[in-house]
Amino acid sequence: GHSSYALEDVTARYIFGKKLEGAEAVDALVKIFQEYLRVKEQDTLYKNLELPVAKVLAQMEFNGIEPDMELLDQLAEDMSFRIKKLEKTAIEQAGEDFNLKSPKQLGVVLFEHLGLPVIKKTKTGYSTDVKVLEELEGKHPLISTILEHRKLAKLQSTYIDGLKPLQNPKTGRIHTRFQQTVTVTGRLSSADPNMQNIPTRTEEGKQIRKVFVPGEGYDYLMSCDYSQVELRILACIAKDEVMLEGFKNDQDVHARTAAEVFGVPLEEVTAQMRSRAKAVNFGIVYGISDFGLSQQIKVSRSEAAGYIENYFARYTGVKQYMDGIVELARKQGYVTTLLGRRRYLPEIMHSNFNLRSFAERTAINTPIQGTAADIMKNAMVK
């Protein structure tokens, strides 16, 4: 099929009238794809960035990372105890026995027996997804218990029970797979396990991070990252003077945005203002709507629209960039990153509003997110 990357399927799609197998098929495909890359002006990116990065990733996969299995066992025991305790509490709060993992049973308990307001229905009954539960939080103590139970159960299945079988019996290490060709923006992803998405904000997440330790002969694990890389890229490609000035003066970018959006001096910015400005900053990068922002920061749609309007009034360069890049995408059918990676947007001229809007948001975001990936990969090679 068209979505399959198995050698026989790719060969069938690109080589007509010949039955080629194994190395012969690979050799023929290489010639076809090299020409395809040249025509699309992607050959330099491929040779100078993606191939060298592949070697770095191979070495990283080979090296792996060492887990402290004793700590993992200890966390597993603690997590199981806490989950069982929450299950007992939930049954007491509900006043009846039910399976917390069954959305159907939970729906009956919440909306029929406890009489909580129905937020959303699905084909099979009441919706009990996270958004629904968060909206109901505060209306009954059971809701908070269910949310905590779900959080811990996910951590348990993904990171505690999930990590044990992934330890290599020969090396004693966990060897994740880095995926270089999965995301359309050029970003790397990771699987088995996903080492790029281990939670850090919660206390439980921090404990899981402690499971990964320096191997024998090493004293510490080193972590490197770019500070606010996507917002810095936005400031640069949009040539926005206000945002550039903030970065040049090493200001807290979210506090600076709060001062601009709320019209207060920097020193008078509150924690709530900064939090909302942070949502605006990252939301703008992803082309967020007033409705999307209102849902995220729990304010009215008109208030969210006011924040976005104030943002564009102060950061005029960002607004000009967004309008300009969408127009460019309409003209040429694609957008590019700093190092020339292309993302084609066939839906940018679509008559369907939702498809067209998604393509427009993609046109805005790809040069930012993709350039961040280019910079990160370049640093890895160097």
Regions found by a protein language model. Give the residues of each.
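Conserved catalytic alpha/beta cores of large enzymes that bind or transform nucleotide phosphates
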Residues: 209-234, 245-278
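Conserved "right-hand" nucleotidyltransferase catalytic core of DNA-directed polymerases
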Residues: 2-6, 10-14, 22-203, 213, ...
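Conserved catalytic core of nucleic-acid polymerases
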Residues: 62, 168-171, 175-176, 181-183, ...
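Flexible glycine/proline-rich, aromatic-decorated loop/lid segments
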Residues: 200-205, 251-255, 350-352
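Conserved, non-catalytic sequence blocks in retroelement Pol enzymes and Pol-derived host proteins
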Residues: 100, 246-248, 368
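Ordered, soluble secondary-structure elements with a strong preference for glycine-centered loop motifs
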Residues: 1, 228, 366-370
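A small-molecule sensor/coupling module
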Residues: 237
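Short amphipathic beta-strand starts and helix->beta connectors
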Residues: 203-208, 380-382
